From Swiss-Prot:
Keywords of the record: Coiled coil, Cytoplasm, Cytoplasmic vesicle, Disease variant, Nucleus, Repeat
Location of region: Disordered: 579-603, 657-684
Localisation: Cytoplasm; Nucleus; Cytoplasmic vesicle, Secretory vesicle, Acrosome
Annotated source species: Homo sapiens
Single GO biological process annotation from the record: cellular response to estradiol stimulus
Task of the protein: Nuclear receptor coactivator that can enhance preferentially estrogen receptors ESR1 and ESR2 transactivation. Also modulates progesterone/PGR, glucocorticoid/NR3C1 and androgen/AR receptors transactivation, although at lower level; little effect on vitamin D receptor/VDR. Required for normal spermiogenesis. It probably plays a role in acrosome formation.
Ranges spanned by the short sequence motif LXXLL motif 1, renumbered to the chain: 634-638
UniProt-recorded name of the protein: Coiled-coil domain-containing protein 62
Main location: cytoplasm
Coiled-coil region list: 11-160, 199-322
Length: 684
């Protein structure tokens, strides 16, 4: 066994041990971070409960303060009135004191007079006792006389009524007698002339007597009718008084009802004004939330840009060191195969290598999908002419202004956005030469450049896998085993790695398949959001984001010297949440088949079955969130703002449609099943 081969094998073992140790450390860190996140969630929940209690106590204190202020204002008014009363009373007291002094002098005089009067009072008391005895006797007599007077008055009233009735009868009789006397006189004057008509006059007399009797009977009846009508009038007066009282009561009730309606209208106006204020505050908070989201995204981009630029710088330094070490080790082989290589050529190679890196970065920023593989071919030809048999590894992650502008766009512009970055660069690894084609020297040259930059490649691959959620993917752990890998780093970083050997010109294969190209990935985001959807966002839920292929991935090529296939696996990055209504309709239109077993599973495991010739399985486990983000403080602030918005919306009692929430649980993440690749979903 050659010494460089043993050295390379030792380095591979060291690299695998380093990988295992780093993976274990990362797992421990992940577990610690998950524990910390759970503790912070508990603390946040406790803080929210305490905050709600404080708000309730603040409202109660505020009401108490308002009542106390009203009482204070009333008491101050009463104090002012009483102070004025006290002042007036003090003036009166002073006047009374002066009067009291005068009264004391008068008292002394009156006391002397009282002594004199007391003697007189003793005499008068004796007289008064005698007079009281007389008064008692007189009072008894007065009582008896008053009783007799009452009886006499009653008799007098009865007699007066009888006299009045008799007077009326007498008056009527007098009138009738006067008439009769006149008639008798006339008859006396006419007797002489009409003795013959006596019979007729007698008859008329009898008729008049009968009429008198009838008239007397009618008068008695009319008196009885008058008495009945007076009693009826008294009853009607009592009813009128009672109706007036009822009318006053009804009028008071009407006034009370009018006042109640006025107060209800005032309360409604107050409630409307409060609703408008809360709506305006909600609108402002939503704008603040959108601004914070955009700022957070921009900061995330800046952080990731800085991290990846640092990684680029470290990888370049490691590449330069690795190239120096590989050149020192391969000098003997190069001299045996190509003795005409000069030191000037190596210097030119260094300068051209650096220039071509920056040219490749600029070219890849401005080219589209179709020119990606052609670009790799052109670079391959240039490297063949310039470098000879030296292998070149270029690893670059490019961040452009277009990506930043795309991420700054608000999510609410469309229900489903298909993000196709302009900087579409595929990761292509060219075949190394198998040991059957050439000799041992060429074999060593092919192994050295493929194994020296393992550390830098692993770091880059690990960063890409963390961003895509592929930390547990076996392909991300061993990128050097695959010949062709066409992967995207979702919208942010894209890696191009072209590995080439001069001796293996006949069997070099390029990644011409377009199934794993970034244009075939669709990233679905929430669209226009209503009030109900704002509620579902502001609740502490998780966001769903799906990256999937437009069509089945068919890119797979064989490796010279190692019997392994690199089947293109579908990348699905899932961040768990209840998806919004606008994004659900877009999901249903694009995805034709969905598995019924994935309704309640928070994460999904995609197992891809390879061709039956090799019976190899590649499983990709996708984590829900990126736990390595350095912007935890901003995320906490966002969570607090979300909680505040939910509290406000719950206080305004906005309607929450349960249908959207239940529908989001059923239509979570859907993945098409392809019979050719035999994909199976395992939910856990």
């Amino acid at each position: 066994m050659n010494p460089p081969a043993a050295f390379l094998a030792g380095r591979q073992n060291i690299g695998s041990e380093v990988e295992i140790s780093t993976i274990e450390k990362q797992r421990k860190e992940l577990q610690l971070l998950i524990g910390e996140l759970k503790d912070r969630d508990k603390e946040l929940n406790d803080m929210v409960a305490v905050h709600q209690q404080q708000l309730l106590s603040w409202e109660e204190d505020r009401q108490k303060v308002l009542t106390l202020e009203e009482r204070c204002s009333k008491l101050e008014g009463e104090l002012h009135k009483r102070t004025e009363i006290i002042r007036s009373l003090t003036k009166k007291v002073k006047a009374l004191e002066s009067n009291q002094m005068e009264c004391q002098t008068a008292l002394q005089k009156t006391q002397l007079q009282l002594q004199e009067m007391a003697q007189k009072a003793t005499h008068s008391s004796l007289l008064s006792e005698d007079l009281e005895a007389r008064n008692e006797t007189l009072s008894n007599t007065l009582v008896e006389l008053s009783a007799q007077v009452g009886q006499l008055q009653a008799r007098e009233q009865a007699l007066t009524t009888m006299i009045k009735l008799k007077d009326k009868d007498i008056i009527e009789a007098v009138n009738h007698i006067a008439d009769c006397s006149g008639k008798f006189k006339m008859l006396e004057h006419a007797l002489r002339d009409a003795k013959m008509a006596e019979t007729c006059i007698v008859k008329e007399k009898q008729d008049y007597k009968q009429k008198l009797k009838a008239l007397k009977i009618e008068v008695n009846k009319l008196k009885e009718d008058l008495n009945e009508k007076t009693t009826e009038n008294n009853e009607q007066r009592e009813e009128i008084i009672r109706l007036k009282q009822e009318k006053s009561c009804l009028h008071d009730e009407l006034l009370f009802t009018v006042e109640r309606e006025k107060r209800k209208d005032e309360l409604l106006n107050i409630a409307k004004s409060k609703q408008e204020r809360t709506n305006s505050e909600l609108h402002n908070l939503r704008q603040i939330y959108v601004k914070q989201q955009s700022d957070l995204q921009f900061l995330n981009f800046n952080v990731e840009n800085s991290q990846e630029l640092i990684q680029m710088y470290d990888s370049k330094m490691e590449e330069s060191k690795a190239l120096d070490s590989s050149r020192d080790m391969c000098l003997s082989d190069l001299e045996n195969n190509h003795p005409k290589v000069d030191i000037k050529r190596e210097k030119n190679q260094k300068s051209l290598f650096k220039d071509q890196k920056f040219e490749a970065m600029l070219v890849q920023q401005n080219r589209s999908d179709k020119s990606s593989c052609d670009e790799c071919k052109e670079k391959k030809q240039q490297i063949d002419t310039v470098f000879g048999e030296k292998s070149v590894i270029t690893l670059s992650s490019i961040f452009t202004k277009d990506l930043v502008e795309k991420h700054n766009l608000p999510w609410s512009l469309g229900g489903k956005t298909q993000i196709e970055p302009e900087n579409k660069i595929t990761l292509c690894k060219i075949h190394t030469k198998s040991p059957k084609c050439h000799g041992t020297g060429v074999q060593n040259e092919g192994k050295q450049p493929s194994e020296t930059p393992t550390l830098s490649d692993e770091k880059q691959w690990h960063d890409v896998s963390v961003y895509l959620g592929l930390t547990n993917c076996p392909s991300s752990k061993h990128p050097e085993k695959l010949d062709v890998e066409c992967q995207d780093q979702m919208e942010r970083s894209e890696i191009s790695c072209c590995q080439k050997n001069e001796a293996c010109l006949g069997e070099s294969g390029m990644c011409d398949s377009k199934c794993c190209h970034p244009s075939n990935f669709i990233i679905e985001a929430p669209g226009h959001m209503s009030d109900v959807e704002w509620m579902s966002i502001f609740k502490p839920s998780k966001m769903q984001r799906i990256v999937r292929l437009k069509s089945g991935c068919t890119c797979s090529e064989s490796i010279c010297g190692t019997q392994h296939d690199s089947p293109a696996s579908e990348l699905i990055a899932i961040q768990d949440s209840h998806s919004l209504g606008s994004s659900k309709s877009a999901l249903r239109e694009d995805e034709t088949e969905s598995s019924s077993n994935k309704k309640n599973s928070p994460t999904s495991l995609l197992i891809y079955k390879d061709a039956p010739a090799f019976n190899e399985k590649a499983s990709i486990v996708l984590p829900s969130q990126d736990d390595f983000s350095p912007t935890s403080k901003l995320q906490r602030l966002l969570a607090e703002s979300r909680q505040m918005v939910t509290d406000l919306e719950l206080s305004t009692l906005l309607p929450i449609s349960h249908e959207n929430l239940t529908g989001s649980a059923t239509n979570k993440s859907e993945v098409p099943e392809e019979s050719a690749q035999k994909n199976t979903f395992v939910s856990y």
